[in-house]
C-alpha cells in the first residue's frame, strides 16, 4: 500500500485557488462548533452560512458553492432539513461533505448516515472509528472520540471511497486522504488540537470548501488537512494552553499564503 505525501507546490496551488474562489459553504453543522467553524472558514478566506430551516436549507443548497452535513447534534427536525439539503445539492450538483460524528456509537445517526450515503457525498471526513463504522467494518469509538489508529482505517476508507465515489478523509495523528486508489498522508499538527472542541468539525467545513475548487480534488482536500495541521503547529508555539490556542489558530490560518506553502 503506497502512501504519497502532499508537496508544498500542491498545497500552495490549492490555497491560491481557495483564495481566488472564496467558496460559499452551507454549514449544517452541530450546535457546539458553529462559531468556531464559521471563523475558521472566514480566516482562510471562505464565506460560511448556517442555514438550518428545512425550506431554506433546500433553497440555499442550490445557491452555495458547497454543503457540509455534520450530524454531531442530530435531531429529527434537523435530519429532515439535512435530507432536504442533500437532495437539493444532488439536483443542483452542489458538492457536499458528510461528517459522521459518533456514527459508530449511536444507532439513529448511523442509520441516517447510511441513508445519506445513497446520495453519494463528494467527500466524507471522520476519525478512524467513524470511518470504519460507516464502512460496516466495525462499530466503535467512545462518543465523538476514536478508539482506533488512523492507519488502521485506510482499508475501510478505500472501500468507502470506491463504493460511494467520495474522497474519504481519516483524521488522526497522521491524516489519510483517499479516492479509493491513491492515498495521501498528511503529517503534522499537535495533540493540543484535540483539546479544543471543533477542530475536526471545522476541518470538515474546509474540506467541503475544497470540494468546490477546480483541479485535482484529492490534492485539494489533502491540502485542507495540511493547512489545518500547519496552523495548529504555529498556534501551539504561541499558546499556553487550549484557551489561548483558539485565537492563535485563527490568526495562523489568516496568515497562511501560497508563498509560505511553496
Curated annotation (Swiss-Prot):
GO terms for molecular function: ATP binding; hydroxyethylthiazole kinase activity; magnesium ion binding. This is Hydroxyethylthiazole kinase. Coiled coil: none annotated. Its cofactor is Mg(2+). Substrate binds at residues 50, 198. ATP binds at residues 125, 171. Pathway: Cofactor biosynthesis; thiamine diphosphate biosynthesis; 4-methyl-5-(2-phosphoethyl)-thiazole from 5-(2-hydroxyethyl)-4-methylthiazole: step 1/1. Belongs to the Thz kinase family. It holds the Pfam family HK. It catalyses: 5-(2-hydroxyethyl)-4-methylthiazole + ATP = 4-methyl-5-(2-phosphooxyethyl)-thiazole + ADP + H(+). Its EC number is 2.7.1.50. InterPro entries: Hyethyz_kinase (IPR000417), Ribokinase-like (IPR029056). Catalyzes the phosphorylation of the hydroxyl group of 4-methyl-5-beta-hydroxyethylthiazole (THZ). It comes from Escherichia coli O17:K52:H18 (strain UMN026 / ExPEC). The gene is thiM. It is an enzyme of class 2 (transferase).
Amino acid at each position: 500500500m503506497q502512501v504519497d505525501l502532499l508537496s508544498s507546490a500542491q498545497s500552495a496551488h490549492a490555497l491560491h485557488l481557495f483564495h481566488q474562489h472564496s467558496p460559499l459553504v452551507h454549514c449544517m453543522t452541530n450546535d457546539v462548533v458553529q462559531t468556531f467553524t464559521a471563523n475558521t472558514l472566514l480566516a482562510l478566506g471562505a464565506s460560511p452560512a448556517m442555514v438550518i430551516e428545512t425550506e431554506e436549507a433546500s433553497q440555499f443548497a442550490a445557491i452555495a458553492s458547497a454543503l457540509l452535513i455534520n450530524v454531531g447534534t442530530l435531531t429529527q427536525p434537523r435530519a429532515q432539513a439535512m435530507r432536504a439539503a442533500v437532495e437539493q445539492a444532488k439536483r443542483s450538483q452542489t458538492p457536499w461533505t458528510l461528517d459522521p460524528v459518533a456514527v459508530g456509537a449511536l444507532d439513529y445517526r448511523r442509520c441516517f448516515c447510511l441513508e445519506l450515503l445513497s446520495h453519494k457525498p463528494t467527500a466524507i471526513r471522520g476519525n478512524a472509528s467513524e470511518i470504519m463504522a460507516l464502512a460496516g467494518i466495525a462499530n466503535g469509538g467512545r462518543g465523538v472520540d476514536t478508539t482506533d489508529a488512523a492507519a488502521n482505517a485506510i482499508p475501510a476508507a478505500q472501500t468507502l471511497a470506491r463504493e460511494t465515489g467520495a474522497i474519504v478523509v481519516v483524521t488522526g495523528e497522521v491524516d489519510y486522504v483517499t479516492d479509493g486508489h491513491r492515498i495521501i498522508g498528511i503529517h503534522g499538527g499537535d495533540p493540543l488540537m484535540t483539546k479544543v472542541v471543533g477542530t475536526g468539525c471545522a476541518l470538515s467545513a474546509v474540506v467541503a470548501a475544497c470540494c468546490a475548487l477546480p483541479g485535482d480534488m484529492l490534492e485539494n482536500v489533502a491540502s485542507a488537512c495540511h493547512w489545518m495541521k500547519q496552523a495548529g503547529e504555529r498556534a501551539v508555539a504561541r499558546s499556553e494552553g487550549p484557551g489561548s490556542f483558539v485565537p492563535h489558530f485563527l490568526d495562523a490560518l489568516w496568515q497562511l499564503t501560497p508563498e509560505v506553502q511553496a
